């Protein structure tokens, strides 16, 4: 996203609850903030910002069909997409369970306003169904049990990632492998 999109096109907010290696993106002009465990005030403020942005965009888009694509097409104006990254969702939820309802709301309603979430998890059951159902696209890296692929993606027609590090699969019209 940082390589192919300007800060006028996308704004990233990154919460890293794993190795904190995503701090490397902190200086990118598209990144508003990189937050880690213990950044309580920053995380609370992010959810306030997202709520305000959602309210503002709801009003702004109302005269143009109510969604970001219609607004851009009909008004001729551009507005940046907002992408929130949560690396290691289970650790995030363990520390900030009070924000779970916010996550459910933003992942369900946010896409029409240009607010998107990218969430990582170590185990297939780290993300509760109430949240998981709000994601249209999932990418799965190596899992221990082949039945876990179907638990996440549905029927994978016997397609599993090669046993090379970094390989995974995702499902669109069919199942694809990626590196």
Residues of each region from the PLM?
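Conserved P-loop NTPase motor module
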Residues: 95, 99-101, 165-179
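Polar low-complexity intrinsically disordered regions enriched in Ser/Thr and small residues
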Residues: 68-69, 169
């Amino acid at each position: 996203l940082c390589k192919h999109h300007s800060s006028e096109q996308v704004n990233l907010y990154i919460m890293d609850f794993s190795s904190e290696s995503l701090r490397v993106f902190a200086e990118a002009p598209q990144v508003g903030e990189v937050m880690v465990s213990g950044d309580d005030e920053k995380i609370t403020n992010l959810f306030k910002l997202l709520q305000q942005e959602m309210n503002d965009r709801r009003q702004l888009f109302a005269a143009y069909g109510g969604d970001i694509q219609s607004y851009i097409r009909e008004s001729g104006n551009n507005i940046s997409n907002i992408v929130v990254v949560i690396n290691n969702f289970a650790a995030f939820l363990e520390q900030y369970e009070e924000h779970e309802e916010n996550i459910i709301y933003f992942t369900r309603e946010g896409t029409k306003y240009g607010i998107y979430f990218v969430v990582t998890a170590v185990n297939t059951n780290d993300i509760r169904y109430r949240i998981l159902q709000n994601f249209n696209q999932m990418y799965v890296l190596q899992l221990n049990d082949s039945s876990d692929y179907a638990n996440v993606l549905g029927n994978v027609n016997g397609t599993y990632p090669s046993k090379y590090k970094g390989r995974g699969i995702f499902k669109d019209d069919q199942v694809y492998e990626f590196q």
